[in-house]
């Protein structure tokens, strides 16, 4: 597609140390008072899932340079600061064929979207104008908003401690620990709430395009660096953590940088490229096993969160529905886990070049034991 041109050469990055992350616990237990439910619970029905959805290519684009970027302010509440003159130039450059990451003609996309922030909407508008389509429809989705900073709102991005505290929660969520809080945030209090918010926006974009699609289709969404990178790393089947941490040293994503994913809400998502660097579809053995364990851990956390939300709402029907859905989701994750691990191991053996199947199996067993 037009938005995926030849690779750009990555800038050299400083040495970095990747901290080991322990995959502890398989879920979150919510301690809550018992709420009476009218009548007995219905029988729990387990449904089979058919993976037959059409794939979408989604280009997630960070906004152009904003006044907050220039002043070094963490601003995560809409409407936020506008873009600068340089930011407007960056947005217009997205329509230039000389840009290695230039976007396709607006008419190519099934939908063009932006968050509630001024900076994303201005970036989209300036690109559309430069592409000769100033009147092209632009849909606004609050789910695409920046990852909320909580108590860090308005603090300096140049303060390394503040920047680190802002990323503690998101980094934990990427490794399956959705329960870790985002300090002081009522918008994104934890990974479950953020997953629901941004994931619902992506699903809405998908549904809008899939309505009339007989085959694959594409959409573009203008969002923010932290929300784009966090949700993508939480959800894709082939997360490239080395590439992520290298980009983290440079601010995660540059202004108008892009992350491209492909897939659908039913079968899941694959990372295609990160800021112009293509990503292998097969994540490799260790990353594949990590994703299998991550998916197993996430299911009970999401179920527990939705049940807790229903309990707080106090509607017995909502509580019953949350229990039903949560049970089905956790059971599906537990049932799918053994086969997912087997598929990951056999896939790694098939892709291992120059080594025997026994060596590959030994590596797999060592990874599981470690």
Task: Describe the role of every protein-language-model region.
Residues 66-71, 149-150, 230:
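Short acidic/His/Gly/Ser-rich catalytic and metal-binding motifs that mark active-site loops
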Residues 77-86, 117, 181-192, 250:
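Active-site metal-coordination segments of metallo-dependent hydrolases
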Residues 114-117, 143, 217-226:
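Short, well-ordered beta-to-alpha junction loops that form the rim of enzyme active sites
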Residues 92, 118-122, 192, 196-199, ...:
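A structural signal for well-ordered alpha-helical segments within the folded catalytic domains
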Residues 201-212, 219-224:
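Charge-patterned, long linear interaction tracts outside catalytic cores
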Residues 130-200:
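Phosphate-handling substructures
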Residues 1-61, 66-67, 105-106, 116, ...:
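Composition-driven, intrinsically disordered low-complexity tracts enriched in small residues
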Residues 55-140:
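Active-site-proximal alpha-helix that buttresses catalytic centers in soluble enzyme cores
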């Amino acid at each position: 597609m037009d938005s995926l041109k030849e690779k750009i050469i990555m800038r050299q990055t400083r040495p970095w140390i990747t901290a080991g992350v322990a995959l502890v616990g398989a879920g979150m237990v919510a301690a809550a008072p018992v709420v009476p439910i009218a009548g007995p619970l219905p029988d729990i029905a387990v449904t089979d899932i058919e993976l037959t959805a059409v794939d979408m290519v989604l280009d997630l684009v960070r906004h152009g340079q904003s006044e907050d970027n220039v002043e070094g302010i963490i601003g995560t509440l809409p409407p936020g600061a506008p873009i600068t003159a340089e930011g407007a130039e960056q947005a217009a450059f997205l329509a230039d064929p000389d840009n290695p990451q230039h976007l396709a003609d607006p008419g190519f996309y099934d939908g063009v979207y932006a968050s509630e922030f001024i900076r994303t909407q201005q970036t989209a508008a300036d690109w559309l104008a430069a592409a000769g389509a100033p009147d092209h429809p632009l849909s606004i989705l609050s789910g695409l908003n920046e990852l909320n900073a909580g108590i860090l709102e308005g603090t300096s991005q140049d303060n390394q401690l503040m920047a680190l505290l802002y990323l503690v929660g998101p980094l934990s969520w990427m490794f399956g620990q959705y329960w870790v809080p985002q300090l002081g945030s009522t918008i994104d209090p934890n990974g479950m709430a953020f997953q629901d918010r941004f994931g619902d926006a992506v699903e809405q974009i998908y549904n809008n395009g899939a309505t009339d699609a007989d085959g694959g289709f594409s959409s573009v969404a203008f969002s923010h660096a932290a929300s784009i990178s966090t949700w993508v790393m939480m959800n894709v089947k082939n997360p490239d953590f080395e590439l992520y941490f290298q980009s983290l040293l440079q601010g995660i994503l540059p202004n108008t940088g892009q992350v491209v994913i492909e897939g659908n809400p039913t079968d899941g998502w694959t990372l295609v490229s990160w800021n112009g660097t293509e990503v292998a579809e097969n994540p490799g053995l260790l990353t594949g096993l990590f994703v299998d364990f991550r998916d197993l851990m996430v299911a009970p956390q999401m179920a527990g969160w939705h049940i807790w939300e229903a309990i707080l709402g106090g509607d017995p029907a909502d509580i019953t529905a949350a229990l039903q859905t949560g049970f089905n989701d956790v059971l599906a994750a537990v049932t799918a886990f053994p086969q997912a691990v087997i598929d990951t191991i056999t896939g790694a053996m098939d892709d291992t070049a120059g080594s025997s199947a026994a060596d590959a199996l030994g590596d797999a067993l060592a990874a599981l034991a470690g």
